Amino acid sequence: YLDPGLGAPAPYPDPLEPKREVCELNPDCDELADHIGFQEAYRRFYGIA
């Protein structure tokens, strides 16, 4: 049990998270990301990540 007032602070939000979610919702992009990584897969489908 961890007291929510103690412990590590919340991690910084990932600036790429919205793009990661877009890629995850596209089955082809999501599959490609499993092989070559999210940023490269996103770039191939949508342009610059």
From Swiss-Prot:
Principal localization? Answer: secreted
Q: Which residues carry this modification: Hydroxyproline?
A: 9
Limits of the Gla domain: 1-47
Q: Which UniProt keywords apply?
A: Biomineralization, Calcium, Disulfide bond, Gamma-carboxyglutamic acid, Hormone, Hydroxylation, Metal-binding, Secreted
Query: Its domain of life?
Result: Eukaryota
Identify the residues that bind Ca(2+) 2. Answer: 21, 24
Tell me the residues on which 4-carboxyglutamate occurs: 17, 21, 24
The record's similarity note reads:
Belongs to the osteocalcin/matrix Gla protein family.
Q: What is this protein called?
A: Osteocalcin
